[in-house]
């Protein structure tokens, strides 16, 4: 089921999410809904607070397959990159954000089993961006420079 994506200004987006302790059918439905919502919105990542659920849950797909992160923690990061980012909760705006080039993340999967990922470049940015959402941080807080959207010429 496609869910409504909360937009910038909604106070839920500034709240800290709580850990997931129950790995059950409701969690699986939420993960499936989040993924469907993200794909429908043509995004590459979505955090549970963006659909109004203050739980530490993230879905990501940068065209390498679905990644589900429950209770994610960044365990290491190195390097740096300055790239353009957007957000499904701040439609129509993009900005340059500094992020690490490499990120290691540990989390749990939908069944509560431990998982680890190493993301670089775009995946590293996606990990950082979505985990920021779980802490009430929006990418607009980190924008170095806003980027003008190009007008569609028809």
Please provide the spans of the model-predicted regions.
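Positively charged
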Residues: 1-154
């Amino acid at each position: 089921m496609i869910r409504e994506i909360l937009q910038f200004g909604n106070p839920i987006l500034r709240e800290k999410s709580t850990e997931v302790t129950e790995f059950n059918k409701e969690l699986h439905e939420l993960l499936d809904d989040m993924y469907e919502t993200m794909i429908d919105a043509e995004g590459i990542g979505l955090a549970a607070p963006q659909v109004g659920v203050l739980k530490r849950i993230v879905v990501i797909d940068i065209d390498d397959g679905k990644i589900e992160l429950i209770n994610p923690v960044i365990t290491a990061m190195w390097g740096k990159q300055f790239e353009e980012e957007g957000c499904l909760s701040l439609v129509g705006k993009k900005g340059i954000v500094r992020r690490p080039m490499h990120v290691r993340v540990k989390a749990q999967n939908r069944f509560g089993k431990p998982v680890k990922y190493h993301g670089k470049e775009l995946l590293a940015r996606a990990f950082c961006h979505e985990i920021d959402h779980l802490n009430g941080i929006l990418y607009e807080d980190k924008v170095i420079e806003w980027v003008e959207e190009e007008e569609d010429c028809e």
